[in-house]
Amino acid sequence: MSVEILNESGAEVDVSALSRLSRFVMDRMRVHPQAELCVKLVDEDTIAALNLKWMGKEGPTDVLAFPMDELRPGLMTEEPGEAILGDLMLCPAVATRQVDEARAQGQTDHTVEDEIDLLTVHGILHLLGYDHAEDEEHREMFALQARLLTEWQGTRGSGALPDDVLTGEVP
């Protein structure tokens, strides 16, 4: 699997760990070994501009997914084909703010690294065709996201997920 991580955010992020996580998720989701993924870490101005241009929403967001091939969940065959998953745009500054706000409210004890991991898994699932616009889709996607994160954390022995991530509750 080809995973390219580009850190243009100025934030200190373990790009090697992010690459390993991306490969782990792609492997668990049975993505073709020659599939391509690009994860770009960007600043708030960059992600805000992309959010406005592509989503019609003002302001920065935590993650945006730009799928290349039209993949859909549940359509994986015994031998999944080669694919270009697409691009993920992650904003470490927004992730940091989300963690700080959740901690201030006593809602989480996970780290910024855990949040970036969560956003990476979330984005890859979007690239694979998962969505959370409807309640049932939300439950399915967030349950899968929680399972993948739990498995990943078991491989590296750290991290604490908030209850809503583990349960897939609809906010």
Where do the language-model regions lie?
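An acidic/histidine-cluster motif and surrounding catalytic segment
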Residues: 1-117, 128-171
